[in-house]
Design a protein with these regions (language model features):
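Canonical tetratricopeptide repeat
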Residues: 59, 93, 127-128, 162, ...
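Terminal, low-structured helical/coil segments at or just beyond the last alpha-helical repeat
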Residues: 2-11, 185-223
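Structural signature of tandem alpha-helical TPR/SEL1-like repeats
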Residues: 32-45, 66-79, 100-113, 135-148, ...
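Alpha-helical segment of the N-proximal tetratricopeptide repeat
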Residues: 16-55, 59-66
């Protein structure tokens, strides 16, 4: 599983790779070892060498998000958008940063932009659902987006988790419980799903807003 919806760069660059490609590979390897701060330091020279690298800016955005540096993450994602406006990963990453910055209208807009660019990818529909849930609005649209993600990839536990939260937001507790149980059957060790199910069962205190940090960033997806 990848750390989010950006395609991971190769950890070992091919022979003849540019200095920027070497930097991206090194930063990717460090990120995979859960050292985003060191990965940023490895990636900065790569971006200085090739500031037109979309993959480098996307990776930088992911690293900044992992470090809770949301404004720099947004700036990196915007660089990628400017370089490759047709690539859905950049607006989806920007959407995540915007949600964390509390800029919910912009987050929803960017999430839908990713869907428009690549409507067959469930990750973007999941991002729409999360943008709306985080904004605490348009719960029917969030539920529809989560259901669409499940339809596109019924084998990904995270999408059932998202669907469960959307159903809960709509007040459909029994359906939400079933969605969370489905998610946990597929991925029993997801603490976020465990907690939300406990909340529905009256065994834990409800959080003020849905969160998915700490277990799945953007919804992990098998690549």
């Amino acid at each position: 599983m990848s750390s989010d919806f950006a395609q991971p760069a190769a950890a070992t660059p091919e022979a003849g790779a540019s200095p920027a490609q070497h930097g991206i590979a090194q930063a990717t390897a460090l990120f995979e070892r859960m050292d985003p701060a060191e990965a940023v330091r490895a990636l900065e020279p790569a971006l200085a060498a090739d500031p037109s690298s979309v993959e480098a800016w996307l990776l930088m955005a992911r690293l900044r998000l992992a470090l809770d540096e949301n404004q720099p993450a947004l700036e990196a994602a915007n660089k990628a958008i400017a370089l490759a406006p047709e690539d859905p990963r950049a607006p989806a990453t920007a959407s995540r940063a915007l949600s964390l910055l509390g800029r919910h209208d912009d987050a929803v807009t960017m999430a839908y932009r990713a869907v428009i660019a690549d409507p067959k990818n469930p990750l973007w529909h999941d991002r729409v659902a999360w943008a709306l849930l985080t904004a605490d609005r348009q719960f029917p649209d969030a539920e529809q987006a989560a259901r669409t993600a499940i339809g596109l990839d019924p084998n990904e536990a995270h999408y059932y988790f998202t669907h469960g939260l959307a159903l809960d937001a709509l007040g459909h507790a029994d359906q939400a419980r079933q969605a969370l149980l489905t998610s946990l059957r597929m991925e029993p060790d997801n603490p976020a799903a465990q907690h939300r199910l406990a909340v529905l069962n009256g065994e834990a205190v409800r959080e003020a807003a849905p969160r998915k940090r700490g277990f799945k960033l953007f919804g992990r997806k098998k690549d």
